[in-house]
């Protein structure tokens, strides 16, 4: 049996929670992703705890708790300034929506609880003394960099179809490979993904897409035909096949969506709908549209100063990132340096505003907006000094 001697602070801080449960006569373990990441020497953000205590028994032991998912056996305990999800050992049955169990049964056996988990590398538990409980050779799979379903993969994916996306996502994040039977079960059951909400799929897709091994994971995503069951990808395998051959993997979500849109050759008028279909936020959609617009511009010609100003620093940098990933030559340093050298970089930095123009006899309306934009363009391109006096003289000369 493996024993971990040196534990990160996140586990040490949670030890009194396990000790409290054990002192009351219950079993308690750290479980799941935190144990996996500990053994992989990855940063552990938070820990999950599983116990033989029923939810009401957990609540009696701790002064502060929240019923976060009490029907399914989960109580959040507030302790030492941290919150800990504590879930009773359980088995599950009946998955009519291919996502959540219809019935949860509390059990007194850790083994039964671990059997219901998705992958061997996530079906690991650790006790108070750092002893690892490994019923399904998860530690061996960690060593061999393998994602393998616990037990029968078909059964696991029928219980929760999102697990198919999670499997591919883990290959990207962890740089692991899919075990043969697990991959075959995804190929045989990929259509079940249609039963899952787009929001859930999107979350896994983004994690897959910006993971360090995303190009290889994307190839699995295509080969297993999961790509046929997500918004707007059906029948587009040939276009998307370029993704695994990209120069680099994207590390930003904006870059990921921009790359997908470019590969799909979506016209500008379809971008907003595509982003909505994937349940992206308006802010994300706006950022991606700006990147695509600037990417098209730099693909066509070298931008002038005002075009750099209109794009803004973040869009310029993000677009350069996309161009590099696609292997498109772009004078990145020159573009950024030129932007940083602009007389003004934001509309608010202009020395005057619309009220200044009104004070000088201009009526509110389209002409005022046009004049303000013209002044801004002249200032940005260093053809007009950014001062009220210089702008006032420019207005007088117009008259």
From Swiss-Prot:
EC number: 2.7.7.72
Top-level EC class as recorded in UniProt: transferase
Alphabetized InterPro entries for the sequence: Bact_CCA-adding_enz_type3_sf, CCA-adding_enz_C, CCA-adding_enz_firmicutes, NT_sf, PolA_pol_head_dom, PolyA_RNA-bd
Annotated signal sequence range: none
Superkingdom, taxonomy of origin: Bacteria
Residues holding Mg(2+): 46, 48
GO BP annotations listed: RNA repair; tRNA 3'-terminal CCA addition
Keyword annotations from UniProtKB, A to Z: ATP-binding, Magnesium, Metal-binding, Nucleotide-binding, Nucleotidyltransferase, RNA repair, RNA-binding, Transferase, tRNA processing
Pfam family, any one: tRNA_NucTran2_2
MF-aspect GO terms: ATP binding; CCA tRNA nucleotidyltransferase activity; magnesium ion binding; tRNA binding
Note: A single active site specifically recognizes both ATP and CTP and is responsible for their addition.
Subunit architecture: Homodimer.
Family in the record: Belongs to the tRNA nucleotidyltransferase/poly(A) polymerase family. Bacterial CCA-adding enzyme type 3 subfamily.
Name of the featured protein: CCA-adding enzyme
